[in-house]
């Protein structure tokens, strides 16, 4: 689960 592109 990646949450680094949370705009």
UniProtKB/Swiss-Prot annotation:
The keyword Heme does not apply. Keywords: Amidation, Neuropeptide, Secreted. Its main location: secreted. The keyword Disulfide bond does not apply. GO terms for biological process: neuropeptide signaling pathway. It comes from the Eukaryota. The modification Phenylalanine amide is found at residue 7. Found in the nerve cords and a variety of ganglia particularly in the anterior regions. It is found in: Secreted. GO terms for cellular component: extracellular region. Has effects on muscle tension. Belongs to the FARP (FMRFamide related peptide) family. This is FMRFamide-like neuropeptide AF2. It comes from Panagrellus redivivus (Microworm).
């Amino acid at each position: 689960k990646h949450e680094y592109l949370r705009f």
